[in-house]
């Protein structure tokens, strides 16, 4: 019986090896599926937030004259405000509201972070308004901060009777999935 390959030891070793391989395969598939689901939901959330922000920009906000009701450099006055850049008529934007949001988002890192809930976003944001003679930007520019994921939405609007192009970017430099 010394020359037989199918001895008890060989069968036992193959069973252990096969079981180990099977367990590793199940673990590997579970981790990759978990990562895939987390990444997918993260992108879906970002897409929803960029669409929501794009729509919110055209609203007048709450209250309609929110920019007159706050101090742009004091985030404690922003409590009961929802930010919108529109005047409440179609796709017309308010220069005063744009300038107020620019001041709010660029005053300090803490004030920028405080503007995110006012805009309804949990990720970082960047809003760019371009016309033939002016460019206005609010938020953090993503491409100098090594973004992990970026979602962009574009729309046309009117500012002081001049057509403008609004680009809304929601981005993050953190992973969505398992770290």
Which residues fall in each region the model found?
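Glycine-centered recognition micro-motifs in short, flexible terminal segments and loops
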Residues: 1-18
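Long, compositionally biased, intrinsically disordered regions
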Residues: 15, 22-179
């Amino acid at each position: 019986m010394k020359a037989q390959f199918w001895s008890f030891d060989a069968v036992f070793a193959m069973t252990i090896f096969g079981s180990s391989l099977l367990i590793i395969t199940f673990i590997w598939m579970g981790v990759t599926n978990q990562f895939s689901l987390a990444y997918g939901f993260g992108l879906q959330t970002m897409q929803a937030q960029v669409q929501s922000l794009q729509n919110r920009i055209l609203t007048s906000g709450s209250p309609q004259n929110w920019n007159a009701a706050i101090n742009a450099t004091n985030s404690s006055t922003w409590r009961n405000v929802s930010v919108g850049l529109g005047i409440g008529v179609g796709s017309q934007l308010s220069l005063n509201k744009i300038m107020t949001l620019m001041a709010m988002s660029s005053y300090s890192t803490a004030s920028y972070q405080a503007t995110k809930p006012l805009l309804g976003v949990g990720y970082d944001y960047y809003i760019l308004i371009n016309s033939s003679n002016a460019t206005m930007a609010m938020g953090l520019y993503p491409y100098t901060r090594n973004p992990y994921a970026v979602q962009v939405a574009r729309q046309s609007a009117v500012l002081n009777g001049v057509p403008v192009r609004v680009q809304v970017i929601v981005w993050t430099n953190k992973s969505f999935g398992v770290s």
